[in-house]
Amino acid sequence: ASRNEHIKNKIKPALKQKKVVICDRFIDSTIAYQVYGKKVDINFINNIHKKILQNIKPNLVIVLKVSTKSSRKRLKKRKTRNRYDNFAQSFYSKAQKSFIRIAKNKKNYFIFDSSYNDNTLEDKIFAIIKKRLNIK
């Protein structure tokens, strides 16, 4: 429901105004968490996506690989938690593998190892974004 509202109230209006839209999670997160993590039927999820997206597709997707150890450290540092933060480690492993599986077969997806130092990772990501947006 919240993803539908986000698409309807934020993404679609911005795209109509020819704005660049950046989301930190989108449809692949639903597939990774619901289908591969929680075993929800993929056809069910795909049908929902067709209805709410109406052919909206990301031009560029950045996937950050993170080690199990690093993800646990990051979770411990958070001040607030959500329901996904308390799932078993196997859930996160399945989700991570599914993100990589989804990304490997698509030319507009880029996979980065998040163990790079922040500046190196940031530089690599911005280089791709600039290229995609034709910014020098």
Which residue ranges define each predicted feature?
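Active-site-adjacent beta-strand anchor residues
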Residues: 1, 64-65, 115
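ATP-dependent small-molecule kinase phosphotransfer cores
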Residues: 1-53
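Short loop/turn elements that form and flank the Walker-type P-loop nucleotide-binding site
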Residues: 16-17, 56-57, 105
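Conserved phosphate-donor/acceptor-positioning beta-strand/loop module used by diverse small-molecule
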Residues: 23-25, 54-75
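Short glycine-rich anion-binding loops that position phosphate/pyrophosphate groups of nucleotides
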Residues: 27-29, 33, 67-69, 117
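Residue-level recognition of specific faces of alpha-helices
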Residues: 44-47, 60, 91
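Arginine/glycine-rich "motif VI" loop of SF2 helicases in the C-terminal RecA-like domain
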Residues: 51-55, 101-102
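NTP-dependent small-molecule kinase module
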Residues: 69-136
